[in-house]
């Protein structure tokens, strides 16, 4: 199938992938008076007395805003807010289909961090959660941090945390397949954008000890010239031996490669220099850092990509619907590291040790267990860590 042509036809036919539906009937004078004036004044007064009643008397309890500035849309780059709308609509469809979450797309016309933050904060009272989407790094880190400080609802940048959750889940099972321990393996990442940094942070939180990040200039280490503030922050907690060199240099003897960077950055020869039973997560889309057949030829044991036409797809739809479902179910005030790690552990646990193989380390997107299992784990973690409000 030519997905580009067929998708364009679908969008022309439907003129959008979402719509607003009423949950109550308006077919009589009494219906109208209850749904709107004069009856609607009473729930307004209840919410005025206690704003938390907005979760009980409106759709806020299940409503997520999917918000972008259009600056880093898929692999298309800075295409602007209007052009980002099809992706935001698509995200809303996935929220509903896989998590039962009502989501609404919002494309904001500003690249100014404070203006974006204030805009989102000003409308946050209408929503139970905020999903940030397709915002360029390093601006996305500052936006998320500031919104988390200001808002009392979950703020979650899926390009960071959804990818990190799935990666941790897949890597947990991949290590079982090859019989290695997270505390001992050497992990090398390619890329230092939103996804890579969040992946590394979550791996460190989960107990991985030996991680080196690489960008276009090679290994990132404390004291390297030209690092921006977020790379300096990561340099303080990774590559503690402060080794320089290229990506190829960093991969020598490494156990795990995680790529969220650019096509073709890894060769068969580079994989051959890695430790035995190497694990390769080549997640650049649509063309990975190295194709699975080349990685296999180089000696890799377990290989994952971001593509659906190869085994072990890293697909964020495995995470964000269930994460928000779980957060909403307990009216969480935040989505913290413990909740993300719980989501990853739940995903990994859906595949039994007997089922695990080199080509089956991550559940399939349409596995009906995924959403409910992730949601339950996230809700439990929210309760344990004091984020739950009901």
Where are these regions (language model features)?
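N-terminal ligand-binding/catalytic initiation module
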Residues: 1-155, 375, 381, 388-389
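Solvent-exposed alpha-helices and their adjacent loops that cap or buttress functional pockets
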Residues: 12, 55-60, 96-97, 122-124, ...
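Short, ordered loop/turn segments at secondary-structure junctions
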Residues: 69-71, 79, 108-109, 134-137, ...
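Glycine-rich phosphate/diphosphate-binding loop of Rossmann-like nucleotide-binding domains
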Residues: 74, 79-99, 157, 161, ...
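General beta-strand structural signal in soluble alpha/beta enzymes
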Residues: 105, 131-134, 155-158, 189, ...
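Adenosine-phosphate binding glycine-rich loop
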Residues: 158-159, 178-180, 282-390
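Rossmann-like adenosine-cofactor binding region
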Residues: 232-301, 307-309
